[in-house]
Curated annotation (Swiss-Prot):
It is an enzyme of class 6 (ligase). L-citrulline binds at residues 86, 91, 122, 126, 172, 181, 257, 269. It is found in: Cytoplasm. Its EC number is 6.3.4.5. ATP binds at residues 8-16, 116. GO terms for molecular function: argininosuccinate synthase activity; ATP binding. Homotetramer. The gene is argG. It comes from Methanosarcina mazei (strain ATCC BAA-159 / DSM 3647 / Goe1 / Go1 / JCM 11833 / OCM 88). Its main location: cytoplasm. Belongs to the argininosuccinate synthase family. Type 1 subfamily. It catalyses: L-citrulline + L-aspartate + ATP = 2-(N(omega)-L-arginino)succinate + AMP + diphosphate + H(+). GO terms for biological process: argininosuccinate metabolic process; L-arginine biosynthetic process; urea cycle. This is Argininosuccinate synthase. CDD domains: ASS.
Amino acid sequence: MVKKVALAYSGGLDTSVCIPILKEKYGYDEVITISVDVGQPEEEIRKADAKAQKISNKHYTIDAKEEFVRDYIFPLIKANGNYEGYVMGTSVARPLIAKKVVEAAKKEGAIALAHGCTGKGNDQLRFEAVFRQTDMDVIAPMREMNLTREWEINYAKEHGIPVEATKSKPWSVDENIWSRSIEGGRLEDPSFVPPEEIFEWTKSAEDAPNEPRIVDIDFEAGVPVAIDGEKLGGYALVKKMNEIAGENGVGRTDMIEDRVLGLKARENYEHPAATVLLAAHADLEKLVLTRGELKFKKIVEEQWSEMAYAGLVDDPLFADLNAFIDKSQERVTGTVKVKLYKGALTILARSSPNALYSEDLVSFDSQTIDQKDAEGFAKYHGFQARMYRKVVGK
């Protein structure tokens, strides 16, 4: 029987060297590669396809862009998904990619699933949370062989595999429609200032336009549906916002991130659309949700983000959290006006047919509320603190 293994394939260094390794070191007869398009550059998809056609036994390229935005990004927006300041583009993409790999593996009759993740990062966990729901073997050559990037570069050259990474410029890039991450090489030194050349989606504040860009974003039930009055599909909307915000220098993050395993990592991200859409959505929520809803939702959001970051999207608790979030978003409909200027984002205004804000009630000139009625409340505000002072004698 022909032994087949299905490999999650990006076209990068790690997954490219996995192909000969799976044959030479693990004894598989055929390596089936699967690339999943979640918004990578078209050229990257084309190169991955061309490379895989030469070095793998069979290759799939699966278009999952709309599915990614609809089923992963929009729920993230509704949840105000954020892990330590990271918008989790890579985090939420991995489970979808893994599921597509499993589907292809079953179609091909593969007996094993493989990925090119290292033993130090989070992606191994995200892939395997999905892979291990099957009865197939799971293989992680990078982790199991304890490979270094330098070894991989040399191995690739020995096997005639073209790679873009070099020893002098070894950083790696992971990109989808929601975010672009740049890591590795000198970037791992937190004291090293990243060169401007690593950024592709965003202009520096110095190079951004000298005039601010004002944008209106329409939401329906927590989901962005239009930019400046133009209705757009999910993928098209995120793509357009990436272009608008990136042009104005909005959406860069340089951070120290706590990985699931406990390691701290220096990460550089570009996420223009995510920065704007998340800020606008959170602002609109403040207009339409009650104080109690907002307070409790923050607890839910933190748990949701922790689980999404770890790739635990198939956990029953994650479904429970989404059920609450979806219910909370039924009234989150309206428009938010933002200003983008030289790397800064400013919320200018917001409106909603479901607004709980009443200009008449809060106005200094309004007589709708009798101010004297607040006296009884004021008398007992801070009551326990006053009792404490009496008891301790201070």
